[in-house]
Structure formats: structure tokens, C-alpha cells
Amino acid sequence: MVTETEKEMERRAYARVGLLGNPSDVYGGRAVSFAVASLWATVRLRPSADLLVQPHPRHDLVAFPSLHALVDRLDGGGYYGGVRLLLAICRIFHNHCKDNGIALEDKNFTLSYDTNIPRQAGLSGSSAIVCAALSCLIDFYGVRDKIRVEVRPNLILNAEKELGIVAGLQDRVAQVYGGLVYMDFSQEHMDKLGHGIYTPLDINLLPPLYLIYAENPSDSGKVHSSVRQRWLDGDEFIISSMKEVAQLAYDGHNVLLQKNYTELAKLMNRNFDLRRKMFGDDALGELNIKMVEVARSVGAASKFTGSGGAVVALCPDGDAQAELLKSACQEAGFVVEQIEVAPSALTKEELASLSSHP
């Protein structure tokens, strides 16, 4: 009989939208985020004699028809594909198991990946690849019950940190858990538990939401940099603004439970306005700001899904306003689509295990 660990497997992780609280997750704050069902990364693992990480035929190109084609590819997609992400999570997974006395069977595999998440659009495409790969490794080695759900986002983030990617835990929590999640990253929890407090919520609490994006590659890692230093230096404006952003997620959690979407719209707008004041227009980028302003021109609430490249919008006045939003976005040359939220990614056993830890 062929077991799960002896045959090919495929695992999926979804793009993430930060609804409220970003970027305070990097600063001991809070966040409300969810996974997007239409955008995902898949990783395939099959047993093999040698350990092989396969490059993607499009994202890891090393052969080109011409020098011009090579430059076009680098201008549009940068130098990095997904192979480095797979290598990094393999190393982090191995070392975590070694450090925690988790025995791994001596066997090899071949990893490959695919993704339809727009590159550098603030939708956590990189961490989706890492998350899906971690799921494959956990199941291939049969250690799902030995690596707690709450710890998995840390492993994903550590893999990305190895590659110099600047980010917080929010994205990885949303992708490990799936669905809609409220997160508290207060330093007290991080110091005591080694992770935040993550609360899965019913996805039906969300109103209709819209995703707006442009093909506008922008290195989201750079957006955090100067603000981070000012925060470390004790800049009072940055510290107080980050606290307010975190409070928006706290308030938003309660607003969602009440399905008070008029108030949710106000919180979303305030979130973006605070980000803009902290980071400045040059860091946010003209096209990113335009996406927000186009949505707001029809009265929709809007904010970045992450650090730029895509926007999440809410139409508090309903369907007629949503039609206006679609027209305005299309006229401006932006992609707009209604969001379908991905369901929880956790098993019944994993959901039950969450309640047994504070």
C-alpha cells in the first residue's frame, strides 16, 4: 500500500489581504487579514532518489531568445524567482526539527512550484510559496502533529529573513491559517509564547470587498526601512501612529463582529491615511496612491493590502457604488475584481489544538 508520504503531493497557500492594522504587525501591533481564494501558490513534492529543487519555467528563467528579452524580463520581474524560497524553507525546516528533537526519516524528494499571484503587488506571493512548501515538508515527513500551527508562521518568516526580505508575521499567519484571522502581536505575547495570539473568525462576517491592482513591480521590502529606523530611534510621531494603526485592528475586530460596515469603511480609510503620513508619498509610490484615490473618488473606502501594489476597497453604499468603482478602475487602467475569501486551511484537529494553548 502506497502511503501519503510515498506519493506525489500538492499543497496550496493563498494570497493575503491586510484588512486593518498593517504595518503595525512589524511593531508589536495588531492586524485583521484574510486569504484570497482566487490567487494562490502551489508546491508539489514527489519522492525521488536525489533531492532536487526544480526552477519554474517562467519565474526562474536562465535562457532567453536575446539580450533585449533578458533585460525585459529583469525589468518586469527582477532577479529572483522561487527557487531561493524553496531552498530557504528546506533549511529552516531541517534546523527547526533538529533543534527540537523531531526525527526526520532519511529520504529525498523533488520540489516544484507554480503561482498565479501577481508579483510584487503587496499580496504576499513569496510567502505563499514558502507556506505551501512547508506544508509539503510537514506532510512528507509526517510531522504535522509535532510542529504547532502557531509556530509555522515563524518558520516561514525566518526563511524569508534569510533572504533579506523585510516583513512581519501577519502575512504568514493569514496563509497558514487561511480564512479570516484577528492577530495580536503585542510584545508580552511574543516574549512569553514566541508568537502572537491568533483568532480565526467566521469569513461571513466580511462585507463584499474588492481587489484593485496594477502591474507595477515595487520592492515592498524597501517601504518599511526609514520608518523602522525612526521607530527604533524613539520618534514619537511614528510610535504614536503605529499604536493608532494597531488600535484600528482592535476596533475593526469588534466592528466585524457587529457587521458595522459603515464604521469598517472609516477604519480602513484611517489606516491608509496614517500610513501615508508616516511613510510619505515618495515611499508609497504615485501609482499606488492613485489606486486608492480612484476608489475613493466614488466614495469607496480603500487602503493597501500590504505595502503597495494592490488595494482593498469596500463600497458601504452597496451594489450601485460597486459598479461605479469597477468603471472608475477600468477607466484608470487598473484590474478590479470582487474578492472571494479562502476558507480555513486548518484541519479539525489543528483548530481544536489552538484552544489548548493561551
Where is each model-derived feature located?
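C-terminal nucleotide
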Residues: V2-L20, S24, S33-A37, A41-E105, ...
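Gly/Ser/Thr-rich loops at beta-strand to alpha-helix junctions
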Residues: G309
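DPxDG-like acidic metal-binding loop motif
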Residues: G122-D145
